[in-house]
Amino acid sequence: MRHPEHQYLDLLAQVLEKGDQRIDRTGVGTRALFGAMIRFDLSDGRVPILTTKRVYWKTAVKEMLWFLTGQTNIQALLKENVRIWSDWPLARYRKETGDSISQEDFEKRVVEDNAFATRWGDLGPVYGKQWRRWLGADGREYDQIAELVQTLKSNPASRRMLFHAWNPPELGAMALPPCHMVYQYHVTSSGKLNCILYQRSCDLLLGAAFNYAAASALQLMLAQQADLTPGEFIWFGGDVHLYLNHLDQAREQISRAPRPFPTMRLTRRPDSIDGYRISDFEVDGYEPHAAIKADVAV
């Protein structure tokens, strides 16, 4: 049986060979395809943490747990040594103040100075805000995650089990509009929880691996809370691209042979979706190839 990671490697190769090349918002330039799908089966306990390069899965899961808190300030992430969101507020700070502060010093100030963090560490109404506190036209805040969990428990045959973060009136205030936009869930008659993730924009070299790991972790949490078992994770990409400064790294990754996916399990069951901690996740059998370094386009 062909290793499921080959779906990802094949997509890398397709973008390299057939992608439409153009200059993008960041100025770096991309090679892109429009429309892609990958399916992973989580029912045997194995999760798609890519093996053809080391993926720092704890960072991805910590980010997902942060989203679930509804927070939008990077201070909490930095206290967990998660630095993947620092580029955007740092760029804003440098632009607005003219200060050429280093990223290390900027992050240190965000962690240690609450007033500075409040002024410069907030990302605007990004994922967590929309997932947990979507502001309706009636002035009420809607908790999409709580509604999803309740529906999974009370009406698992529903076709309305989804949440998303694309809130047009608030897009302009976000540091970055949502890339992984829509999560939809489906429960089979045998009690398996399936997930579709639609991602409008996918940085295929850097972003996709995190999205696969984080979405799988969320699927495990939701399944546990609703007394279900994980089923399929199905990923759809809209604009699937490689930045032009990532092409050599993509070729290196394609040259590597996949190794067995690791297993992920939850070591305890919290009372609610809000109770999970990074220590609740145990990954076994992860023996990837070496990490591949690449710069983030801001």
Swiss-Prot record:
One of its GO terms (molecular function) is thymidylate synthase activity. InterPro entries: Thymidate_synth/dCMP_Mease (IPR045097), Thymidate_synth/dCMP_Mease_dom (IPR023451), Thymidate_synth/dCMP_Mease_sf (IPR036926), Thymidylate_synthase (IPR000398), Thymidylate_synthase_AS (IPR020940). Disulfide bonds: none annotated. Keywords: Cytoplasm, Methyltransferase, Nucleotide biosynthesis, Transferase. It is an enzyme of class 2 (transferase). Its EC number is 2.1.1.45. GO terms for biological process: dTMP biosynthetic process; dTTP biosynthetic process; methylation. NCBIfam families: PRK01827.1-3, thym_sym. Homodimer. Belongs to the thymidylate synthase family. Bacterial-type ThyA subfamily. This is Thymidylate synthase. It comes from Rhodopseudomonas palustris (strain BisA53). The gene is thyA.
